[in-house]
């Protein structure tokens, strides 16, 4: 990105008027946040993407962490973050301007031992009960697209607990997370395919048009140059997290 100092000054004025870029980070996505630094800051693909934005702008970075993506999205109008790294979804886009995705994560279902459900299409049937983490990007997709099955929403890992304890027919989740769950549930299976891919993007609150254009250009260059792929490899999430096209 070869920007004039005038344009960079406009971007800084919208994204970091105090000289600090406040980056909203969703801690619940273990593929994108894989640990903590010695200073206690989040570490992983998403924090590194945010840090690179700050470096390009020659400003300091401050990580603003959230337990769930829904909480991060809800804070878009509270002036607590300047960029937010979460899944881009239409509901969230009412208050957030998103870039195109920089990475994708498949979402699918886990079914218990003995389940008659064998495909993604089998799940959306009358009488089928799906446990899903509330406010996750894929939960928003299911809310918009499931026509016959019943959705049971719970906060975070409680969706898994309810799936096991209440005997639901399917657990919706990111494939990489379900791979860990299936090992703890003898006979359970992860269905082939996906019902959606979560599009991980960078967003900024509505009304920051110059900043939004800068972020869009940054993401496209980060993908094209191989920077996103390098981060994915560096943090050991290759094969579970993929660069978006």
Question: Where are the model-predicted features located?
Answer:
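Ligand-binding clefts/hinges and TM-proximal coupling segments of bilobed small-molecule sensing domains
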Residues: 1-13, 137-154, 220-245
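Extracytoplasmic small-molecule ligand-binding "clamshell" domains
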Residues: 2-87, 92-94, 225, 234
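Short loop->beta-strand "edge-of-pocket" segments that line small-molecule binding or catalytic clefts
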Residues: 20-26, 43, 121-138, 150-151
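Periplasmic-binding protein-like
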Residues: 27, 103-114, 175-220, 238-245
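Ligand-binding cleft/hinge of the Venus flytrap
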Residues: 33-39, 50-60, 99, 135-156, ...
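Short helix-initiation/N-cap motifs at beta->coil->alpha
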Residues: 62-74, 117-118, 152-163, 198
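A ligand-binding cleft/hinge motif common to bilobed small-molecule-binding domains
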Residues: 70, 74, 87-95, 141-144, ...
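Flexible hinge/capping segments at coil-to-helix
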Residues: 100-102, 111-129
């Amino acid at each position: 990105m070869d920007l004039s100092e005038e344009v960079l000054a406009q971007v800084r004025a919208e994204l970091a008027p105090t000289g600090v870029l406040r980056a909203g980070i969703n801690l619940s996505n273990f593929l994108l946040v894989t640990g903590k630094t010695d200073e206690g800051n989040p570490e992983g693909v998403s924090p590194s993407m945010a840090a690179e934005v700050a470096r390009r702008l020659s400003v300091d970075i401050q990580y603003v962490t959230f337990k769930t993506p829904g909480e991060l999205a809800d804070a878009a109008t509270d002036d607590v973050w300047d960029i937010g790294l979460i899944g881009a979804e239409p509901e969230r886009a009412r208050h957030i301007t998103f870039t195109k995705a920089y990475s994708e994560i498949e979402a699918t279902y886990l079914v218990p031992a003995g389940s008659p459900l064998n495909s993604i299409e089998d799940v959306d049937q009358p009488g089928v009960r799906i446990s899903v983490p509330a406010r996750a990007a894929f939960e928003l997709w299911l809310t918009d697209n499931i026509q016959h099955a019943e959705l049971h929403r719970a906060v975070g890992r409680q969706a898994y607990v309810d799936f096991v304890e209440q005997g639901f027919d399917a657990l919706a989740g990111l494939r990489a997370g379900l791979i860990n769950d299936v090992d703890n549930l003898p006979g359970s299976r992860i269905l082939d395919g996906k019902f959606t891919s979560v599009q991980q993007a960078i967003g900024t609150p509505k009304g920051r048009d110059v900043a939004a254009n800068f972020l869009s250009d940054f993401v496209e260059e980060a993908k094209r140059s191989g920077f996103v792929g390098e981060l994915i490899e560096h943090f050991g999430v290759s094969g579970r997290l993929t660069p978006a096209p």
